[in-house]
Regions:
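Non-catalytic C-terminal accessory region of glycerolipid acyltransferases
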Residues: 1-11, 98-276
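A transmembrane-helix-recognition feature enriched in membrane-embedded lipid enzymes
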Residues: 1-30, 54, 61, 74-83
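Short, basic, glycine/proline-bearing loop/turn elements
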Residues: 15-16, 82-89, 195-201
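Short amphipathic alpha-helical segments and helix-helix/interface helices
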Residues: 16, 55, 77, 101, ...
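Structured helix-beta-strand junction loops
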Residues: 22, 37, 82-83, 107-108, ...
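Glycine-rich helix-loop-beta junction characteristic of Rossmann-like nucleotide cofactor-binding loops
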Residues: 31-35
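Catalytic core of membrane glycerolipid acyltransferases/transacylases, capturing the structured
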Residues: 36-93, 100, 128-156, 160, ...
Length: 276
């Protein structure tokens, strides 16, 4: 299979990528860990819409990202097709998307996957955003609240932990209300006070990983390359960074749960360095 849209992909990469680099001034660490040839699966955390730019700009290879089908039904459909993305219908078990991804790997190309299966962003989860807004709805308009949650890149995995603690009567509503704009810091305080364990805080850094990445690696012999994105998407903030982590393979005899846990651990270990 010949890689489609490679010329357009390259043009988009250098035009949009140049603007991205100038605007956000990101850092790239351990780019040498990304293999220059052969089938690979790049896997990382996903909070911001622009997350795929960082891995794409880290390698000369064309990176085929799996993206939700809705993007291909939008006015920007051509861009996603030209970027080599594979549409995924998340409302069903999408065998067509899986077959396309396996074909990419069997041809020796590079695939990008967000193993959490969705963006770990409160701002883009309508129902969960409204649930958290209930704690401050008398103080701030909904649109402004959403804007703050988006700017601060608040994670669903961390707000879910707070709601769990509330349900278990370990905290009260006022605790959430008073700390809703500093959720990560508040969770660290709860860890220090032994209200939550270190493992509970650690697990709040990511949503539970799906098995797609390690499963496809096992079927194709592809190398899994984990990465972690840290920092904020702010103009010239210069703390946005992608760090590539130790690659690994998944043999036919490996346990997928163990390998999926290995993938999650690599990413969370790196995120933990920047969360405290």
């Amino acid at each position: 299979m010949k890689e489609k849209h490679k010329i357009l992909y390259t043009i988009n990469k250098y035009l949009l990528g140049g603007f991205f680099l100038a605007y956000y001034r990101p850092k790239f660490e351990n780019k040498h860990l990304v293999p220059k040839d052969g089938p690979i699966i790049l896997c990382g955390n996903h909070v911001h819409l622009f997350d795929q730019f960082l891995p794409i700009l880290s390698t000369k290879r064309m990176l085929h990202y799996m993206a939700k089908k809705e993007y291909f039904d939008s006015p920007f459909a051509f861009f996603f097709k030209a970027s080599g993305c594979i549409p995924v219908d998340r409302s069903i078990h999408d065998d067509n998307a899986k077959s396309s991804a396996l074909e990419v790997l069997n041809e020796g190309y590079a695939l990008g996957i967000y193993p959490e299966g969705t963006r770990n962003s409160l701002a883009c989860k309508k129902d969960k955003l409204k649930e958290m807004y209930e704690f401050v709805n008398e103080e701030i308009p909904f649109k402004k609240f959403k804007k703050i949650m988006k700017k601060d890149m608040v994670k669903v995995s961390q707000t879910d932990l707070l709601l769990k603690l509330l349900a278990e009567n370990k905290i009260i509503k006022d605790n959430i209300k008073n700390n809703i704009y500093r959720i990560n810091e508040y969770l660290l305080e709860l860890e220090s006070a032994n209200v939550i364990t270190s493992n509970e805080y650690y697990d709040s850094l990511l949503l539970p990983l799906k098995y797609g990445a390690v499963s496809m690696a096992q079927k194709t012999g592809a190398i899994v390359v984990p990465y972690a994105i840290t920092g904020k998407y702010r103009f010239s903030k210069n703390n946005l960074k992608v760090t590539f982590l130790k690659p690994f393979t998944v043999s036919s005899t490996d346990d997928l749960t163990e390998k999926n846990n290995e993938l999650a651990k690599e990413i969370k270990d790196e995120l933990l360095k920047y969360s405290k």
